[in-house]
């Protein structure tokens, strides 16, 4: 009898929870329709994996890619709509947030075809890999629209947990296990630091958690210039710094890049920076509105350290992935210039444009590294010597992406950096822009050093890895070629396309 009553109570409680969830989706689902599509795709992946055999593997890729493409389409259809706040103020939808969500979806859409051949050759578990990628994408999208401190903490944790699992996906690899352990420990420490900063912000504002209400609370309590806000700013800057990985919060980056599977590195190298940049712009610009000079100084220090250390240490690297890790540290220094400039002088517009180009340049480079690594089993920069003699298409496409990363004209990277530096110069960041220009010249050196190796034709310099190089017989090679071609074309867009891209980005400002 007791069991029967408990069972009825359980059914009633479950029904209430289901009805409440249905009510939320019914009245708020339109605000998170792209996210709902990804959730539906995740459910389909689980259902197919639990009810089918290995012959349905192409369906897993198809469902993942289709859900991402439909989410992008839903975002584009919602473009230019009025800003909306939903879920009791926890989530905000506007053009500024949506363009960052678009960039995250674009990264994931390009990373899935880039991963197909790698997964087939290494016999990795496919379903779990796709589930983690989609869930991380979902966490990044929620972070872009987060409007309160709780959501800003929970959303990146969703992204981070999937990132830890992806980085340690090849559990038999000692380097992967070591990288995951460092990533997990430093990620947990940074989350604790971030929450501690939030607690100071929460207390100083009189118990408010919504971003705009925090500003109102600071005005009401007259605490906007208090030491507590300075303490909160320091802790939050350190916490967000781990996600952006500028120096000196970069220690995890080279090890994770080197030890993780290459498609995972490609995914994390762009999505984490896009999501963290979206979060940083909102946190610094809204709750710390009265401390703008203080957080500008903090970010300027991070940008200078990142540009100098990242590009100088990249010169000494012998591993291709570690070189790109330090290169990404330098690249985030350029992005921080746009965050500092902010809403004035098109700072956000230039930052968004450069991040779009950075996605194409970086993913195009990693697509070539995946192809070369699967055929040779090496990641050493010297082993790329003479690749042009065996695979001219791979060598030329890699060279174009590297030149674009270095910022040589007339490639997209040059015009992206030019507009970003010009906005910083107009905002009076003369020293910061000068450091950016000098370190860009340094980055060109180590990129050209790799290109020289690629194009060398002397037999004594060609390594055995290149001599034994063979093209892949797998049909899945077409998917990585497609992803690479898209990235290379986007990386070589001439400057004539800058004006419409900048114009679209300007429409995303607050």
Swiss-Prot record:
Membrane protein topology class: Multi-pass membrane protein
Subcellular location, record wording: Plastid, Chloroplast thylakoid membrane
Catalytic activity: a plastoquinone + NADH + (n+1) H(+)(in) = a plastoquinol + NAD(+) + n H(+)(out); a plastoquinone + NADPH + (n+1) H(+)(in) = a plastoquinol + NADP(+) + n H(+)(out)
Enzyme Commission designation: 7.1.1.-
Chief site of localization: plastid
Keyword presence, DNA damage: no
Top-level taxonomic group: Eukaryota
Keywords: Chloroplast, Membrane, NAD, NADP, Plastid, Plastoquinone, Quinone, Thylakoid, Translocase, Transmembrane, Transmembrane helix, Transport
One GO cellular component, as annotated: chloroplast thylakoid membrane
Biological processes, Gene Ontology terms: ATP synthesis coupled electron transport; photosynthesis, light reaction
UniProt key word S-adenosyl-L-methionine: no
Pfam families: Ndh2_N, Proton_antipo_M
Class of this enzyme: translocase
Membrane-traversing stretches: 24-44, 57-77, 99-119, 124-144, 149-169, 183-203, 227-247, 295-315, 323-343, 347-367, 395-415, 418-438, 484-504
GO molecular function annotations of the record: NADH dehydrogenase (ubiquinone) activity; quinone binding
Known partners and oligomeric status: NDH is composed of at least 16 different subunits, 5 of which are encoded in the nucleus.
Similarity field: Belongs to the complex I subunit 2 family.
Its biological purpose: NDH shuttles electrons from NAD(P)H:plastoquinone, via FMN and iron-sulfur (Fe-S) centers, to quinones in the photosynthetic chain and possibly in a chloroplast respiratory chain. The immediate electron acceptor for the enzyme in this species is believed to be plastoquinone. Couples the redox reaction to proton translocation, and thus conserves the redox energy in a proton gradient.
Entry protein name: NAD(P)H-quinone oxidoreductase subunit 2 A, chloroplastic
Origin species: Buxus microphylla
């Amino acid at each position: 009898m007791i069991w029967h009553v408990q069972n009825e109570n359980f059914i009633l409680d479950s029904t209430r929870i289901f009805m409440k969830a249905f009510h939320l989706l019914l009245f708020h689902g339109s605000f998170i329709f792209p996210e709902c599509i990804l959730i539906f795709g995740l459910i389909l992946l689980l259902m197919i994996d639990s009810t089918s055999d290995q012959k349905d593997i192409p369906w897993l890729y198809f469902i993942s890619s289709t859900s991402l493409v439909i989410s992008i389409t839903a975002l584009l259809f919602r473009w230019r709509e009025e800003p909306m706040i939903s879920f009791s103020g926890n989530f905000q939808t506007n053009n500024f947030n949506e363009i960052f969500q678009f960039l995250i979806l674009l990264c994931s859409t390009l990373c899935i075809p880039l991963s197909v051949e790698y997964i087939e050759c290494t016999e990795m578990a496919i379903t779990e890999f796709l589930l983690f990628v989609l869930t991380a994408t979902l966490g990044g999208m929620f972070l872009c629209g987060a409007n309160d401190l709780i959501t800003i903490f929970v959303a990146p944790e969703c992204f981070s947990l999937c990132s830890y699992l992806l980085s340690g996906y090849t559990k038999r690899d000692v380097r992967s296990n070591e990288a995951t352990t460092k990533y997990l420990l430093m990620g947990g420490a940074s989350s604790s630091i971030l929450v501690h900063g939030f607690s100071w912000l929460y207390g100083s504002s009189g118990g408010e958690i919504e971003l705009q209400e925090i500003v109102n609370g600071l005005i009401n309590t007259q605490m906007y210039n208090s030491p507590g806000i300075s303490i909160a700013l320091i802790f939050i800057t350190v916490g967000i710094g781990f996600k952006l990985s500028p120096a000196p919060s970069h220690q995890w980056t080279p090890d994770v890049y080197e030890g993780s599977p290459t498609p995972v590195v490609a995914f994390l190298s762009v999505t984490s920076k896009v999501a963290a940049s979206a979060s940083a712009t909102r946190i610094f610009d809204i709750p710390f509105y009265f401390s703008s000079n203080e957080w500008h100084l903090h970010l300027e220090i991070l940008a200078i350290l990142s540009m100098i250390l990242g590009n100088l240490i990249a010169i000494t690297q012998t591993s291709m992935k570690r070189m790109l890790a330090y290169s990404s540290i330098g690249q985030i220094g350029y992005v921080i210039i746009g965050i500092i400039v902010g809403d004035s002088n098109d700072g956000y517009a230039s930052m968004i444009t450069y991040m779009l180009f950075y996605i194409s340049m970086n993913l195009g480079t990693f697509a070539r590294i995946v192809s070369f690594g699967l055929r040779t089993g090496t990641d050493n920069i010297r082993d790329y010597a003479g690749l042009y003699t065996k695979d001219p298409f791979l060598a030329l496409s890699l060279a174009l992406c590297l030149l674009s990363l270095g910022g040589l004209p007339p490639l997209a990277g040059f015009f992206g950096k030019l507009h970003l530096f010009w906005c910083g110069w107009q905002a009076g960041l003369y020293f910061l822009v000068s450091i950016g220009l000098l370190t860009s010249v340094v980055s060109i050196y180590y990129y050209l050093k790799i290109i020289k190796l690629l194009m060398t034709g002397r037999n004594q310099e060609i390594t055995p890895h290149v001599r034994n190089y063979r093209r892949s017989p797998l049909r899945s090679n077409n998917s990585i070629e497609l992803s690479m071609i898209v990235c290379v074309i986007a990386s070589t867009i001439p400057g004539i396309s800058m004006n419409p891209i900048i114009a679209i980005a300007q429409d995303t400002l607050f």
